[in-house]
């Protein structure tokens, strides 16, 4: 009988037009105490972000079919191109999760983190300058997931529904309630042709006469609304053009996936045709004396793309054209992403 190793180390690399160059390393032990406990140390470095996290998971907490664990993390993000500031966070989270059925599971998570808005430029919006410095977030969240997809990559049928409710307050300096919902449905029309339709929406509201900081608001554009730049849609300072985030958002997408004519199926190339819509609006920026450009107008973009499941990982190129937009929106026609692990 040969004993198999339960530890592994992996490396990753990637690039996207929204996140820049990315690289990561992960060290994992899947049987720490001989009962399937998992511990993982991960480091992700990018031109616009850095993430370090240590996680531990007990798969059968209290001898039940319930997972529990913790995460310790530090993140930093360069948002100079979006709103002339950078931000970081350090903290920990406690979590537990269990399955109700084959397709339904629930996750409860408590997070305590200290965030910092720094490197604020002198020409940044008054809203950004007023929020420079540290804040503490104490957040309790609950997520329910219903997943009937046949596969996670190149899905041909099934649903994915996810709803998260979070409340921040208690020992923290931030007081807000937030909910987000995502839904997508996949259906094969005929051989190798799949249509998917989906949507998302979110709301975040303050309480106790507080305001919601930039890093707790929603931003729209890039990966979640093609045809528009990262944070290209939503409330914006009329003078500095800084993106200020919003309290309310929604998106919808319809996408057709199909084989490319004359290309052998074995090469793994797929064509994409899509329509994305969405909007982001509402914040408290006016209380800082800023003149804010804001609108609930639905933005619409349509486009084509190519996806290749290469030996080095998935590669995708999209070209989208905004059809409906506001004058102050920032657009981005091409999106490119590549990622692999080895």
Predicted stretch roles:
Residues 48, 88, 175-179, 297-298:
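Short, glycine/acidic-rich beta->alpha junctions
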Residues 1-161, 226-227, 231-238, 314-316, ...:
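Gram-negative/organellar outer-membrane beta-barrel architecture
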Residues 282, 287-330, 334:
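C-terminal structured "cap/appendage" subdomains that terminate the fold
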Residues 7-18, 111-291, 328, 336-341:
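C-terminal outer-membrane beta-barrel translocator/porin domains of Gram-negative envelope proteins
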């Amino acid at each position: 009988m040969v004993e198999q190793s339960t530890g592994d180390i992996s490396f990753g690399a990637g690039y996207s037009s929204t996140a820049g160059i990315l690289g990561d390393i992960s060290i994992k032990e899947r049987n720490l105490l001989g009962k399937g406990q998992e511990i993982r140390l991960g480091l992700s470095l990018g031109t616009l972000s850095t993430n370090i996290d240590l996680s531990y998971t007990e798969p059968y907490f209290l001898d039940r079919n319930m997972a529990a664990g913790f995460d310790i993390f530090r993140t930093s993000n360069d948002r100079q191109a979006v709103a002339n500031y950078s931000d970081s966070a350090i903290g920990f989270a406690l979590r537990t999760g269990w399955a109700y059925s084959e397709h339904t599971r629930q996750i409860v998570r408590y997070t305590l983190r200290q965030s910092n808005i720094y490197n604020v430029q002198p020409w940044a919006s008054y809203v950004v300058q007023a929020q420079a410095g540290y804040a503490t977030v104490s957040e309790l969240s609950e997520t329910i997931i219903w997943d009937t997809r046949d596969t996670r990559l190149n899905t041909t049928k099934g649903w994915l529904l996810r709803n998260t409710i979070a409340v921040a307050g208690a020992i923290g300096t931030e007081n807000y309630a937030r909910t987000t919902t995502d839904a997508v449905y996949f259906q094969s029309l005929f051989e190798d042709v799949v249509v998917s339709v989906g949507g998302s929406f979110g709301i975040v509201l303050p309480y106790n006469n507080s305001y919601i900081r930039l890093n707790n608001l929603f931003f729209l554009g890039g990966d979640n609304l093609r045809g528009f730049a990262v944070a290209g849609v939503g409330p914006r300072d009329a003078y500095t053009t800084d993106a200020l985030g919003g309290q309310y958002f929604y998106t919808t997408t319809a996408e057709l996936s199909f084989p490319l004519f004359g290309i052998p199926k074995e090469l793994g190339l797929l064509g994409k045709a899509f329509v994305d819509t969405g909007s982001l609006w509402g914040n408290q920026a006016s209380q800082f004396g800023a003149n804010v450009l804001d609108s609930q107008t639905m933005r619409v973009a349509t486009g084509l793309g190519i996806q290749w499941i290469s030996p080095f990982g998935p590669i995708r190129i999209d070209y989208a054209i905004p059809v409906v937009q506001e004058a102050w929106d920032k657009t981005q026609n091409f999106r490119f992403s590549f990622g692999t692990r080895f």
